[in-house]
């Protein structure tokens, strides 16, 4: 350490790092405090019921540009069902929250049409502080409902949560979102009211 009238400079230091406790690692053996690389192993090529070919992969920061055209194909009602309120601002600051994620704490999978590269849907999962449970959210283009895309996205995020060792995942769904509630029942989720909000 060097010190003079202009300040203090540390030129040499020793840092000790204690071993992680058992279970303190995320999926694939990554320590939870590590900056995880892009998880390419989660990329999938899938086919919808109508034979549309879809590329499903983890989201990346540069996917922000895909959100504008995507939101143009989502009705106001579907936006309300996803965000629980009308959404008007789709600017950089808003969309960046969805595309710039820490893979050690969260995951989002984006579905793109293989032929055009256009965004078709997205599913997200954010783990709690203890990395034991997570909350999911999903949004699919309104003109693509009924083709099985939502089902594929949900299966992907469920498989990811299992691989990470999460014990439980849950989502908040408005009580009038009957399609989403029905899909969650089919996927094996337990459905119940939110004691703090009668609309959920």
Per-range role (PLM):
Residues 1-15, 136:
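Conserved metal-phosphate-binding beta-hairpin within the catalytic cores
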Residues 18-200:
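Long, contiguous binding/interaction regions
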């Amino acid at each position: 350490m060097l010190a003079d009238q202009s300040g203090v400079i540390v030129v040499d230091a020793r840092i000790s790092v204690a071993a992680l406790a058992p279970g303190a690692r995320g999926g694939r053996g990554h320590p939870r405090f590590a900056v995880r690389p892009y998880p390419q192993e989660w990329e999938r090529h899938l086919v919808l019921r109508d034979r549309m070919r879809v590329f499903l992969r983890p989201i990346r920061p540069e996917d922000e540009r895909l959100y504008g055209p995507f939101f143009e194909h989502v009705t106001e009602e579907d936006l309300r069902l996803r965000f629980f309120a009308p959404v008007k601002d789709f600017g950089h600051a808003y969309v960046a929250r969805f595309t710039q994620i820490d893979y050690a704490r969260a995951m989002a999978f984006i579905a793109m049409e293989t032929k055009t590269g256009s965004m078709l849907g997205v599913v997200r999962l954010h783990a709690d502080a203890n990395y034991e449970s997570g909350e999911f959210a999903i949004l699919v283009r309104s003109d693509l409902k009924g083709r099985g895309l939502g089902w594929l996205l949900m299966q992907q995020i469920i498989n990811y949560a299992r691989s990470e060792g999460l014990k439980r995942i849950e989502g908040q769904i408005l009580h009038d979102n009957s399609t989403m509630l029905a899909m969650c029942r089919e996927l094996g989720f337990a459905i119940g009211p939110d004691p703090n909000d009668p609309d959920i």
